[in-house]
């Protein structure tokens, strides 16, 4: 379910896209507008402008009618946001792991035992699954009964990427 914040961000990205490429300020964007915008940004280099416009147009204009609808631009913006999340998922997951270990790894061995892991769920006030053991089994890839920093990082990274895919697949909710 998208939030007003999600819709506001997508709307802002669409507005930014239109502002950047709608040179004649008629409120719509066509493939010619894209080309002219790139031509201006690339100091009149016809070849580079044509190439860049072709790539962007083939990416955004899904029905190939030469015009960009709100849905097409919003999907493009959502896909770009997803790419950014995927590119940053590794770094963000590492920060998540460090914060989690700092708070719950009582013996500072860079692993969470079942007892330490259960503390995480108690602190959150809920469990995404009915059985905490099931969650531990999902994250504990080497099945040693503990969750290592690497296993946590993979789990956090996967959750971030899955979320980005879900947001992108959902598209705008207007």
From Swiss-Prot:
Alphabetical list of InterPro entries matching this protein: EF-hand-dom_pair, EF_Hand_1_Ca_BS, EF_hand_dom
Pfam families according to UniProt: EF-hand_7 (PF13499)
Annotated binding of Ca(2+) 1, by residue: 22, 24, 26, 28, 33
Keyword Metal-binding attributed: yes
Residues noted as binding Ca(2+) 3 in the record, renumbered to the chain: 140, 142, 144, 146, 151
Source taxon at top rank: Eukaryota
Residue intervals of the EF-hand domain: 9-44, 60-83, 92-127, 133-162
Binding site for Ca(2+) 2: 105, 107, 109, 111, 116
An annotated Gene Ontology molecular function: calcium ion binding
This protein's UniProt keywords: Calcium, Metal-binding, Repeat
PANTHER family assigned: CALCIUM-BINDING PROTEIN (PTHR10827:SF85), RETICULOCALBIN (PTHR10827)
Protein name as it appears in the record: Calcium-binding protein F
UniProt organism field: Dictyostelium discoideum (Social amoeba)
